[in-house]
Amino acid sequence: MAMPNFGDMMKQLQEAGAKMQDLQKQLEKLVSEGEAGGGMVRAKVNGRQKLLELTIDPEIMDDVDMVQDLVVAAVNKALEASAQLAQSEIQKAAGGMINPADLMKQFGGQG
C-alpha cells in the first residue's frame, strides 16, 4: 500500500477550512421566513439558525395564548426552512472536500 502524501493532505485540510469559513459567512446571509395565522405572525432566521426578525400583527395582541402559539409556529417554520437551505448550501460547499472515509482508508482504517 502506498504511503499517503502528507503535504497534499495538509493542503486539502487547509482548503477545507477556508471553505468552511466562507460557508459560515454565506449561511449568515441566507434568510428564511416562516409565518403562522395567515401571516399574522412572521419570523425571519438566517442560515445559522439565528432569529433576525419577528413581526406580530397588532390586531391579535389581545389574545396572549394565540400570539404565543403563533410565534412558536412561525419561528419553527422559519427554522425548518433555514435548516433545509443550510443543508443544501453545505452539500454544495462540500463538493471536492476530503471524504473522511477516504482519509481513513489511506491510513489503513475502515471507511
Swiss-Prot record:
Isomerase found in the keyword field: no
GO cellular component: bacterial nucleoid; cytosol
Keywords of this entry: Cytoplasm, DNA-binding
Molecular function via GO: DNA binding
Database matches in SUPFAM superfamilies: YbaB-like
Cell compartment(s), UniProt: Cytoplasm, Nucleoid
Family affiliation: Belongs to the YbaB/EbfC family.
Subunit structure and binding partners: Homodimer.
Protein name: Nucleoid-associated protein CT0805
Organism: Chlorobaculum tepidum (strain ATCC 49652 / DSM 12025 / NBRC 103806 / TLS) (Chlorobium tepidum)
